[in-house]
């Protein structure tokens, strides 16, 4: 189980890297992930909270257990942007004193502005005034020095260390110049006095601190925006509920509501907790939770979720889940936990950040030494070294990945797509093969009546006869007929002597005649059926439908076709995946004929039929040999396959087990959200790469420029103040680039492009076709398929009992005798192998 902590005192990627290393060394810690963006840490393992906090404090930072109060308000407070107001006050004060300092130090020289009379020819007074103003600005921004030197003492230098050293060095050298100038004036050396006057860097020391504060404030403000989606979710949680106690309405805080309590909700109010409607009807706006903009009609017996809005009627509800067990709380937990994890691509930046600051300090010292050896003055060499310190920015590197992940995660949450980890958000876009479970994923998972073909009676009469016998059955196909008849307000006939013919059909007595319903094979054995009618039934079967025959006495009443119909959006979703260069595979336990009919309508690339529930995981494992696999499912039997896949996606309406096993949850239960999730992942990953590129290139170009590498060749020279300005904007630019993701329409497929990839599948894979006698049904297909795929050399077996064949794909040579024996051991006869 992951323990979450709040971490204080971190200012850049070097800090988060230091904390991560310190905690990882604690005995019992299995993994540790620190987020600079949310100032949080996730730790897995058996280590105690006390030992983890002690390790963080030893590293020079503060830590506390997150969510100790376990209240929404505590989480909201944690995400509140507390830094921007503080930095704004610091900035206003710094700019005020800096303006005076710049006026005194440079105004009269650059623009000829007049100085106060008491400064006239009083160089020591001017120096002391600059010293005093600089000290005030340093006190205002003392946090840089406290954190910076604390990091240096703990041997974990960070960005604040670079700022403190840069500004501090400018200040110390300026103080030295002031004392030297005072000595020269006492000795009456006017020329030396003027020389030391130009060695003052008080304005540089102050400007560095002010400009870095500007950058920090912009960065904090932008970082605050990246958590807007999570804050919006937290704000959805209602604060109060109206309970019904002894028939009276009593307003209480939501944390007082218990499971089983009855409460009322009026139009326009938010649902306080997850509940079931016990009285009334309404339409509920679930857009904040699922991204679905159209209100959903709700009646007695339907469930409603916390945070959704009652748009229409007055309803009474019974609480079914409260506190952290509500759907809203679970969504918040998923998004929050994902923010605390790290994407694999972040490891590059982490490794660089760990050595970045010490390396920059060394480069700055080398720069100073080289310029001194080249004969330059101490002031000139120091200016080059300070420029190196203040232009270098580990923050941009550290923020490149987490800000993009946070924004991407928030965008997904707004659309009802929940990524459980940062890794799942990164990996989804690399999908090469999408495996879709048929029932409940491509199809609705509920059989429906698709065709009614009566003979010499009306459709309603046929449906009424069928309804009369099916109403007493629990079979899923019977339920489809019942729903259809009840939808037309039909009443069943009063039948007697109901019988269930095992494996064949149903029958009952009505007006002295037997009404019988069943399969084509069963009814054909009772009465003669014309070839024309049989061909109609065969056509229905080819379309993936199940034709049910009904007769009365010795007369055929008609055919009712039932099918698990394809969701309206399924073909569109599959087409979008294919346009992204993703191969779409449909996985089902149905017989090959029905499966291929559904697959054709849906437009999938490949159909794998006859797969037993326990065989789905094996199919996914085999497909992984060809490329990265994304599995989409909703049932208990999908859980192993979801876990086995590189990325598992669960339909939100599916079972808890499937949702727990998945990496991504689709709250709207729409297949079109699969390409949306892939599209979001690809765009987020691209944004991360852009951020990392600019963060790296900024430092690669900036550090040599600051060190003065180009001065001998091109005369390019960087003033420390411009270096500080560049540093202050670098992190802001990275965060702003991540925020651009918010303007990307992840539902628009127009800019999708195919990503070509090399298949892992062996190009020399062989296939063999086996002619098999004795297979009678889909169960036979499953037995043969399972036995053949049990061979190590067989990657796939496509079996058809109707064709009497098995097409076997081999990854290595296997003798025909072995294949033959494998099938015949199951009780079937192998005629030939080619």
Regions of interest found by a model, annotated:
Residues 1-125, 150, 232, 248-251, ...:
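Flexible metal-binding regulatory segments at protein termini and peripheral loops
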Residues 17, 30, 341, 431, ...:
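Conserved ATP-binding TGD loop and adjacent catalytic N/P-domain core of P-type ATPases
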Residues 26-50, 199-200, 231-325, 422-466, ...:
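Conserved cytosolic catalytic loops of P-type ATPases
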Residues 86-240, 351, 715-720, 726, ...:
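Transmembrane helix-loop-helix hairpins at the membrane interface
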Residues 110-124, 153, 172, 411, ...:
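Membrane-embedded alpha-helical bundles of multi-pass transporters
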Residues 181-184, 190-191, 206-267, 298, ...:
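Juxtamembrane coupling segments of multi-pass membrane pumps/enzymes
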Residues 289, 348, 383, 396-469, ...:
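Conserved catalytic phosphorylation-site environment of P-type ATPases
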Residues 449, 453-580, 592, 604-620:
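P-type ATPase nucleotide-binding
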